[in-house]
């Protein structure tokens, strides 16, 4: 059986999904806190940039994968309006429930669906925009997930991947110190869960860098793939178009 990475640990492919699920079941109730700790609060600016680049308009159909607590979903639903169709999806039931409840609390009524990005339950050429924010690095078969995202995107539509990436060299030493020393300590202090936060830091280091992910998206059949480095490469937003 093939091996894959769970953070820095080498595990069987069929074990990774279970281990990742355990992490997100554990952090679901504190997910927004987790994002604040991992990004020093910058995730709001990164998501705002992604929302602006998505340029969702009234009537659009949008698929938000690994949507978590629904930050992107909320903005997309408002932009698409009553004639649009925006799906809030996640493979993790705990995350999906937290996100669905949060959306309802904010007056956003939009469908939520338990969804594996490697087997997206929608027809070909269905969505105008497909997004995944901070979720791709946790997927076992990233190439399969990207191919599925392209499949369900309409011709002329876009796939957008917002993810932690490779930081610029002058920032690397400070970033490593924060990721491997400060972040687990914060996770233990504020969420009583140092191990989950340690995995999340490790998963970022194992994720493909900017150019590698660009190539993967091209190999999945997307065209005109480009990326924006945000905060010195801490995060990158990749965009690809389906022609």
Curated annotation (Swiss-Prot):
Q: Which domain of life is it from?
A: Bacteria
Lineage of the source organism?
Bacteria, Pseudomonadati, Pseudomonadota, Betaproteobacteria, Burkholderiales
What keywords would UniProt list here? Menaquinone biosynthesis, Methyltransferase, S-adenosyl-L-methionine, Transferase, Ubiquinone biosynthesis
Amino acids binding S-adenosyl-L-methionine? 69, 90, 116-117
The pathway noted for it is: Quinol/quinone metabolism; menaquinone biosynthesis; menaquinol from 1,4-dihydroxy-2-naphthoate: step 2/2; Cofactor biosynthesis; ubiquinone biosynthesis
Family per record: Belongs to the class I-like SAM-binding methyltransferase superfamily. MenG/UbiE family.
Which E.C. number(s) belong to this protein?
A: 2.1.1.163, 2.1.1.201
Name recorded for this polypeptide: Ubiquinone/menaquinone biosynthesis C-methyltransferase UbiE
InterPro entries reported in the protein's UniProt record = SAM-dependent_MTases_sf, UbiE/COQ5_MeTrFase, UbiE/COQ5_MeTrFase_CS
**GO BP: any one term:** methylation
* HAMAP family attached to this UniProt entry: MenG_UbiE_methyltr
Q: Report the function annotation for this chain.
A: Methyltransferase required for the conversion of demethylmenaquinol (DMKH2) to menaquinol (MKH2) and the conversion of 2-polyprenyl-6-methoxy-1,4-benzoquinol (DDMQH2) to 2-polyprenyl-3-methyl-6-methoxy-1,4-benzoquinol (DMQH2).
Listed SUPFAM superfamilies? S-adenosyl-L-methionine-dependent methyltransferases
Q: Which reaction is this enzyme known to catalyze?
A: a 2-demethylmenaquinol + S-adenosyl-L-methionine = a menaquinol + S-adenosyl-L-homocysteine + H(+); a 2-methoxy-6-(all-trans-polyprenyl)benzene-1,4-diol + S-adenosyl-L-methionine = a 5-methoxy-2-methyl-3-(all-trans-polyprenyl)benzene-1,4-diol + S-adenosyl-L-homocysteine + H(+)
PROSITE patterns registered for this protein in UniProt:
SAM_MT_UBIE (PS51608), UBIE_1 (PS01183), UBIE_2 (PS01184)
Q: Which gene is transcribed and translated to give this protein?
A: ubiE
One Gene Ontology term of the molecular function aspect = 2-methoxy-6-polyprenyl-1,4-benzoquinol methyltransferase activity
């Amino acid at each position: 059986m093939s091996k894959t990475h769970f953070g820095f640990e080498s595990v069987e492919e069929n074990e990774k999904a279970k281990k990742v699920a355990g992490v997100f079941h554990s952090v679901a109730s504190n997910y927004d806190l987790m994002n604040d700790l991992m990004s020093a609060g910058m995730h709001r600016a990164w998501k705002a940039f992604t929302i602006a680049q998505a340029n969702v308009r009234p009537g659009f159909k949008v698929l938000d994968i690994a949507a978590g607590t629904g930050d992107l979903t909320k903005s997309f639903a408002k932009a698409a309006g009553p004639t649009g169709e925006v799906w809030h999806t996640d493979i993790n039931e705990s995350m999906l429930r937290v996100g669905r409840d949060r959306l309802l609390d904010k007056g956003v009524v939009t469908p939520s669906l338990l969804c594996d990005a490697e087997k997206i339950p929608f027809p070909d050429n269905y969505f105008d925009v497909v997004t995944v924010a901070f979720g791709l690095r946790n997927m076992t078969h990233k190439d399969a997930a990207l191919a599925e995202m392209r499949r369900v995107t309409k011709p002329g539509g876009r796939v957008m991947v917002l993810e932690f990436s490779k930081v610029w060299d002058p920032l690397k030493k400070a970033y490593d110190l924060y990721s491997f020393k400060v972040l687990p300590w914060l996770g233990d202090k504020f969420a009583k869960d140092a191990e989950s936060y340690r995995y999340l830091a490790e998963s970022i280091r194992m994720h493909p860098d900017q150019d590698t992910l660009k190539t993967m998206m091209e190999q999945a059949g997307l065209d005109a793939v480009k990326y924006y480095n945000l905060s010195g490469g801490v995060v990158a937003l990749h965009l690809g178009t389906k022609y």
